[in-house]
Amino acid sequence: MSKVAIIDFGSQFTQLLARRIRDLNIYSEIFLPNVAFDLIKGVDAFILSGGPRSVPNSDGIPKIVHDILQFNEKTSIPVLGICYGLQILSNYFESDVVSNCNKEFGKTILNIIKNSKIIENIWESGDQAYVWMSHADSVYNIPRGFEVIAYSVLNNSIAMVANEQRRIYGMQFHPEVYHTPDGINLLANFLDIAGCQKDWTVTSFIDDQQDAIKKQIGNKKVIAALSGGVDSSVAAALTYKAIGDQLHCVFIDNGLLRYNEVEKVKQLFINELKIPVTIVDKSAVFLNRLKSITDPERKRKIIGETFIEIFEEEANKLEGVEFLMQGTIYPDVVESGGSGSIAKESVVIKSHHNVGGLPKTMKFKLVEPLKYLFKDEVRILGRNLGISTEILMRHPFPGPGLAVRIIGEITEEKVKMLQAADDIYINLIKKYELYDVMWQAFVVLLPVKTVGVMGDRRTYGHACVLRAVNSHDGMTAESFPFCMDEETQWKFFKCIQEASNAIINSVNGINRVAYDITSKPPATIEWE
C-alpha cells in the first residue's frame, strides 16, 4: 500500500491535509518532527507542513528535514513543503527567509511564470490562479537548484518553486484548504510524481483495524464507552466485529443527554446492532459534582474524571478488563492539542472528555479505533459495517453532553429546559427536511434572563440560542443556511421562526430565542 508521511510542524491544517490525501485513496500518516527517520523512510513521499514556527527565529533546520533531504539526494523520493515547509526547504538550500516581510493572509492571486510537472494540466505559464495564503515569513531569494514557478501578484514574493531533477516542490500557499480551488489537483499531481497507487479505502481500513484491535487486545476484555452518537456506535460495531463477546458495552446516563436518549440507545444497540449493552443511571452523581461549576474547562474535566471513575467501577465487576474503548476521532484530538501530531506544536483550543479530560491516574489502556478518521470517514466506515443511514446521519453530540450547551451553572431544571427546547428544534428541522443537509444543529441555554410579555403579563425568563452549521469534517464550519440556495434559506428561516414560537409557548422558563450566525473560525461549533 502506498503511504505518504506528513511531518507536522503545528499547522491547524495538518489533519485536513491528511484527509485530502485520503480523498485521493492514498494513505497518509502524520508524524512529529522528532520522529526517528528509520521509522518513516519506507514511505513513497514526504510532505512538510506549515506551522507557527519561524525560520529566522529558530535554532536551525530540524534534524528530520536534514534526514529527509539527504535521503532525497540519494533516492529522489518526492518532497513537498507547504508554507513553513517551503521556508525550511528554502533555508536548507541556502535561501534567505525573512520575518514580517510580504505578509499574506487570505485569498491571493498568483502569476504563473513557468511550467512544471506539479502544475501540469492545471495551470501553465502566463496564467493567474487563486490560492489561500497564511504566512508572516517569506522566502527572499531563489533556493539553490530551484526554479520559481509562481510569484504572488500582491507583492511579487516567491509563491511556488520546483527542483524537477530531485522532485522537490514548495508552495507558500495552502493547497489543502478548500479556499484554494485547484489545491486537490496540485496534491494529486505531487502524488502522481511520487508514483503513489490509489489503494487505500475504508474497506481496507476495516480489515487492517480489525487485525490491529485483535493484536492489541489478545484474550483480554474491553469495556466500551457508548454515547449513542455516530462515533461510539461505529467504534463499538468495528470492535465487536473484531473481538465479539470480549467487548462489554456500558452506557452511562449522566443526566446531560438529549431528550429520550436512553430509549434510543436501547433501540440502537440491542435491537438494531445486536450488541449487548449495560445501562447505568448516574445522573445524580454528575449533576451533584457539577453544582456551582461555571468554567467550561472545569466542567469537561469533572465530567471526564467522573466518566472514568464510573467505568472503573463497572469494569471491576468483570474479570480481565484491561481496555477502554472510546469513539475519539481526529477533530477531538486536534482541538485538545493532545496525542500524536499535535501534542507539542499546536495551541490547545479546548479539551475533550475523550482526550484532554482524561485523568492521569486512569487504570485502562485505551482502544481508539477511529482516532485518525474524520466524521465523514466514520460515516463511510459505518455504512460498510451495515449500520443504518438514520443512525449514521445523527448530528454530532459533544461528549460532555448538554453541560457545554448550558452556559454557566448547571441545574436539573436547566437540563430539562434545554432538552425540551432542543427536541422541538430538531423535530422541526426534520419536518422541514433540512436535517440531512446540515452538519449539526442544537440549542444553547444562556445564563441571561430577559423581560418579555405573555398574556398581558410581564415575564422574566431565560434566553436560548439556536445554532446550525455546515461543514466537511468539523475542522471548519459555515453558519447555516447562508451557504445554501435561496429556497433552502427561506425554508430554514420559516423553520427557526416556527421553532422560536414553539419553544416560547411550550418550554416553561424560556421567553426569548436568538440565532447564532458565527462561522468556525473564529468561533468553535459548540459554545463551550
Swiss-Prot record:
Pfam families: GATase, GMP_synt_C, NAD_synthase. Gene3D superfamilies: 3.30.300.10, 3.40.50.880, HUPs (3.40.50.620). Residues 200-394 form the GMPS ATP-PPase domain. Keywords: ATP-binding, Glutamine amidotransferase, GMP biosynthesis, Ligase, Nucleotide-binding, Purine biosynthesis. One of its GO terms (molecular function) is GMP synthase activity. GO terms for cellular component: cytosol. ATP binds at residues 227-233. The keyword Nucleotide-binding applies. It comes from the Bacteria. The keyword Ligase applies. The active site is at 83 (nucleophile), 174, 176. It catalyses: XMP + L-glutamine + ATP + H2O = GMP + L-glutamate + AMP + diphosphate + 2 H(+). Residues 3-199 form the Glutamine amidotransferase type-1 domain. Pathway: Purine metabolism; GMP biosynthesis; GMP from XMP (L-Gln route): step 1/1. Its EC number is 6.3.5.2. InterPro entries: Class_I_gatase-like, GATASE, GMP_synth_C, GMP_synth_GATase, GMP_synthase, GMPS_ATP_PPase_dom, NAD/GMP_synthase, Rossmann-like_a/b/a_fold. CDD domains: GATase1_GMP_Synthase (cd01742), GMP_synthase_C (cd01997). Homodimer. Catalyzes the synthesis of GMP from XMP. This is GMP synthase [glutamine-hydrolyzing]. It comes from Ehrlichia ruminantium (strain Gardel).
